[in-house]
Amino acid sequence: MRINRFGYTLTFLLTLASSSDIYAQRAERSLQYFPEGRGFASYNGKNRYTRALYGGHSDFRLETSDRPVFATFTKKEKRNIRFFLHLADGKRLNFDELELCTAYYFPGQRKYYIRNSSLGIDIDMTAMCCYDNDEAIWRIVCNKMPEGSHISCVVSMIEAKHLYRNGDMGVETTPNFFEASKEHEPLMTTEIKPEKEIYIRYNDGSVAKMPLNDGKTLFAVTQLQSNHLANQVVINTPDKFLNTLGGVLTSAADGIWDEKVWLHGAVGWRVQLPGWRAGYSGDFLGWHDRARTHFSNYAESMVTNIEQKFSHPMQDAALNSARAEKKWGSPMYSNGYICRYPNKADNMNHYDMNLCYIDELLWHLNWTGDLNFAREMWQKLKLHLAWEKRNFDPDNNHLYDAYACIWASDGLYYDSGDVTHSTAYNYRANKMAAEIAELIGEDATPYRTEAEEILKAINSKLWMNDRGVWAEYNDNMGLKRQHDAPAVWTVYHAIDSDIATPHQAYRATEYVTNNIPHVPIKSSGITKDDEMINAGDYATISSSNWMPYDWSVNNVAFAEVMHTALAFFQAGNKEAGFKLMKSCILDGMYMGCSPGNIGQISHYDAARGECYRDFGDPVGVASRLVVQGLFGIKPDALHRRLTINPGFPKDWANADITTPDIFYSFKREGTSDKYEIKHNFANVDTVTLRIPARYTKFDIKNGCQILDYRCDNESFDMPHVIFKLLAKAGQKVSIELKGNGSKISKSKAKVVRVNTGLALLQQENRAWWISTALDESERDKSSLIAGQFSDINVDALEPIDISKHFNAKVTDIFRNRYESPRSPYTTLTIPIHGYSEWCHPKDTVNIDDSGLRKAINDSIFTAPNGIKWLSPKEGNNIVYTSLFDNYPDEALISVGGSASHAYLMMAGSTNPMQCNINNAVVEFLYTDGTIQ
């Protein structure tokens, strides 16, 4: 018998085990909020302090609830604010306990309609944050009040003495943390005489009734500012659940802006970071001035005066060598590194946020075509690319290590491997650097060459044609094997960074559909909207299929789901992309506990559950998903062109979007599809419009000059045509297609070619590709044979003495130091003791085999099923194999004799980075030369 060690972690004997379903359904839930126009409605809702309103760009916010109870927050001061109705008989009623309350969240505003028929109460209330000062304002309209009643407003300290994450949802340790403190008396009570219209202002810890005219003025100004912000992006579609998104995006994005940079989060994690994807928000929502401010401030955070003076590897011994040592002059902390805080190039962080920052900067140039800013940023771009190369491609094979360069990095370590997502980032950066260099008169050759070599290496080393997807990574250590079960970030970064051919991109989305766990979204509600959800086959996804669970490695995270949906749109898999997008919106914004929330983690994440609100990373991705994915707006102003490739579902008859940069609309009437476009890009002269061809023939009615027209030979799911239109800023252009041939139908088409995973259909003069991949539910399983386990005849068992091969105690595994072999380069890797990951490099676990030892009698351990093994009560009791030098790579054990079965007691140690890779293999060598 031979035991071979394949993986780079540890294996010691082995055992059979099954994994629990980390994505098991949580408790049933239903829609908590319903779309009404641009707002979210709740009826006698139960959520408290879950919808934050933001005003100016400080940390001040007003927490609102499904009923009229509130809290305010700044780092220095937190207050609970309640309203009461005092009846003539002395009874006091809390506003949030009155009989009927319909609440609306319109981005930036919370409105309440409070009714109690038995008491004759009819009150309307609106709450907002002010935009010019750290204040809040309420308007109360008393349509009907009980005789002799009046209102009071009570300000109290909050229950929590300390807030762990600024009072964010799902992460605080104190129950009811924003409720009024039970330990302290109210700080103030303001009695308010009943009037038709009342205005109340919160300022500096206290509330006061405002004079009517002053209140009207402040309220009107605040509401005007709120509406202006919410209406910066407006979308109209046939789907009412999507028509709220414009204001949701702009209000959330405004909440993560601090007038210097885009923040990590609006509530929890309200800190400055150069990553992650929050920085996309500015350009995709029309704030190009804010975007430039963000990029300029972090450009000043790049190290430019510290040359590398230490060579690879530079691992931090104090942190068990799991990550880079924070030392100036090391490969990582030297010229080109972007520090954590804006305008400060003197502080170290433990992430490579360069890649994401640079990608956002390049998108900014795509949106603006600002060559002056490109010249200003050129030296920083050069330093960045040189820094990436010397740190993460030191062997110059044009494939890059990934060193904590994406949001999901906390549980990831690639040990200097060749990684798809980081390599894709570097491909796009080099490709665009070459384009920019040509435009500003710099040398493009080194960047064009590197981009070309990267693409060659990706296609030859990382693309797996048999699987239709890229490898997660190729191992640089051990047996240099390939991880062939990639996470979603591998797929969406590859597609987003343009390393994919159209066929590769589409097939990669099919990999996600068929291999990544899908979590159904179901509702226990009884409304028609709840029924729509249950009939719609909606589902969200986890970020990988890796086990065991570890934070960031296999979460149900909104940004990961949304970026995957964006990749589906980009790949032409539009129907699936839309379904995934809407699933995410239903999950977080309507079924979640905060209306219109762009959160971090989903309710369906079994480890964390729903948490965080208006988190920067998903805010940026959601902005791209709506603008670039659903509406297909993709400017390349550096080359004076704009592409529009709508991602609308096939059954939509209309849609339009308005942003500061563009208005365009789609309208279908009968056989006619009409598109109207008016953009405001100063550096764009042409629009390339890619649209479905629903008929084999059509008449074209154009309201502009058509520069080019062709059929798209790389269409998926249905044929498309491409128009190139002359369209300068401010000029309205239109195209109308009126079908006069046969309607496109898969049933009428014939297969004319088959490629791996795809088939080309043709109907008359139109052709398009469809997937031939089968998901697991469609596979023919009739030939599969169920596994069997024979009863064990205990009397026939013969324990084999292999004690001379034992080379360790089971308990030694995480007490050792696995020092060699280790990567010759600075990297993220498994800690020196073989447990945990770089974020928690000192975590460990005590392996206790005392129970096993205690159960041994006369050197025999008997399992509950009667199988017996020889095992000592003391001393070494296991055969360890490992690719680390601590133990041999393999163990050859002579068994002798003959038998029909062999039973082994086995144990193993692994980690998510080795999931779906064979960690070890046991072979039986027979005297006739055969191997089993």
Kindly label every feature range from the protein language model.
Residues 1-25, 140:
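Bacterial Sec-dependent N-terminal signal peptides
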Residues 23-32, 119-124, 128-137, 141-271, ...:
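Acidic/polar, glycine-enriched structural segments that form the non-catalytic walls/loops
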Residues 26-114, 208-233, 387, 629-639, ...:
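An extended acidic
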Residues 74-81, 86-128, 132-133, 563-758, ...:
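Non-catalytic C-terminal accessory modules of carbohydrate-active enzymes
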Residues 116-159, 662-683, 885-903, 911-913:
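Acidic, contiguous internal or C-terminal segments within carbohydrate-active enzymes
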Residues 257, 327-347, 402-419, 477, ...:
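Acidic/His metal-coordination segments adjacent to aromatic residues that form catalytic metal sites
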Residues 271-303, 379-382, 386, 413, ...:
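Active-site core of glycosidic bond-cleaving carbohydrate-active enzymes
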Residues 772-932:
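N-terminal/edge-of-domain interface segments
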